[in-house]
Amino acid sequence: MSSPLSQAFAQNFLGHSPRWYKLTVLAFLLLNPLLLWLAGPVTSAWVLVGEFIFTLAMALKCYPLQPGGLLVLEALLLGLATPEALYAELQHNFPVLLLLMFMVAGIYFMKDLLLLLFSRLLLGVRSKALLSLLFCLLAALLSAFLDALTVTAVVISVAVAFFAVYHRVASGQRASEDYDPATDRQVPELHRAHLEEFRAFLRSLLMHAAVGTALGGVCTLVGEPQNLLIGHEAGWHFVEFFRQVAPVSMPVLAAGLLTCVLLEKSRRFGYGAQLPAAVRQVLAEYAASESRKRGAQQKAALLVQALAALVLIVGLALHVAEVGLIGLLVIVLITAFTGVTDEHQIGRAFQEALPFTALLVVFFAVVAVIHQQHLFTPIIQAVLALPAERQPGMLFIANGLLSAISDNVFVATIYITEVKQALDAGHMSREHFDTLAVAINTGTNLPSVATPNGQAAFLFLLTSSIAPLVRLSYGRMVWMALPYTLVMGGLGWWAVSHWL
């Protein structure tokens, strides 16, 4: 019989993850040294990559930082990579770490302005097809200049606030302190139909906005973290990155927006729900009340945020400094001129990005293993052995399939560094490298909307507080994303294969 202490260790290991998941991770850790001894470092390294992808695919069971971190720690101890190689990877990708540390935090301080923008949109437009199109387009536009995670967080904040307002009224708990929006027990039958329609309405808007972040995120250097990785390797600044990717990103953006309208008109794949008139009236009264409460200080803060957004866009377009440093500039400007000087208030802005920043360091440790064991060299050589006109399309497919089940930052890092090594070795022209870089960028960004695992914004939406409130499950997200996946993936592949 096991002792209480050993039971406590077992319960503490990976927290609330399922028992089968804990045992699987332990099995990986026990298998790797044995495999290294029996099969050698290359086979062992391939298995490690597969194990790490498994932890990414199971991100809803346990955040990948802990199991993935244990795996790469073991890899370093086994000599599959060296700490020096990991440090070299981190130095090489320091601009990406700066982006995650400061740009995401900088946009956090613009949330009030963005919340106001989306709230006005939700109540000001009565046509559901037009509203969905505007949500998708606005999310795309904001993600092109800001950060997809933060844009998604803003849309979630709007949805949570409005859902809670109506749910509280529908359940008759306007003044109740122990109000719980997650339960419908106190919602009378009279309001249940409106509540379910409102849930479907919010689900569709959330999905349109999430897809919009992918449509806009692929277009620019700062739209997604992997874009900065690719742009850094290719030596592209903001305007040059946009120009290189535009032959693929612009047609896909147009097709994605058209898909948005068609889905609302056809009412297929869970789209098309309308905002009930009774719900609109409650939300409009709430918005008017909030507007009346907004004093001179709050209005001044909104003006500062708008000016900081303008500084951000101009700074990015002119590339006055590294992207992360521009994010730090935004933090300083907004906090200084809105009176946010408390250390704990400022610290909240960094909570969202730092766990992912730590996970990115683990990514780079796996990349160091791949480099030191030359794992992807045969694959890249096989692609480069194809006729030049077939290479971009094949890279798009290879990136897309892996990005749909894994993390697109991880996938992009592997492929762009391998292709850059081939360029440095003289195996391709600079022009062809640029074409392959676009294929890698679009391949990791577009088909990855297929599952919540592929896009950080999708995973963030699925694990957020709004998902259970509007009944947005993993399977429902995959189903609602399917038409977008087919259109964006199919047209993206065609554009990469024929228009570059």
UniProtKB/Swiss-Prot annotation:
Regions crossing the membrane: 28-50, 68-88, 98-118, 121-141, 145-165, 205-225, 244-264, 311-331, 350-370, 394-414, 449-469, 477-497
Signal peptide: none
One of the Pfam families matching this protein, by short name: NhaB
Keyword tags: Antiport, Cell inner membrane, Cell membrane, Ion transport, Membrane, Sodium, Sodium transport, Transmembrane, Transmembrane helix, Transport
A cellular component term, taken from the record's GO annotations: plasma membrane
Membrane topology term: Multi-pass membrane protein
Annotated catalysed reactions: 2 Na(+)(in) + 3 H(+)(out) = 2 Na(+)(out) + 3 H(+)(in)
Primary localization: membrane
GO MF entry, a single one: sodium:proton antiporter activity
Domain of life of the organism encoding this protein: Bacteria
Listed InterPro entries: Na+/H+_antiporter_NhaB (IPR004671)
Subcellular compartments: Cell inner membrane
HAMAP family in the cross-refs: NhaB (MF_01599)
PANTHER family tied to this protein: NA(+)_H(+) ANTIPORTER NHAB (PTHR43302:SF1), TRANSPORTER ARSB-RELATED (PTHR43302)
Record family assignment: Belongs to the NhaB Na(+)/H(+) (TC 2.A.34) antiporter family.
Function: Na(+)/H(+) antiporter that extrudes sodium in exchange for external protons.
Name under which the protein is recorded: Na(+)/H(+) antiporter NhaB
Name of the coding gene: nhaB
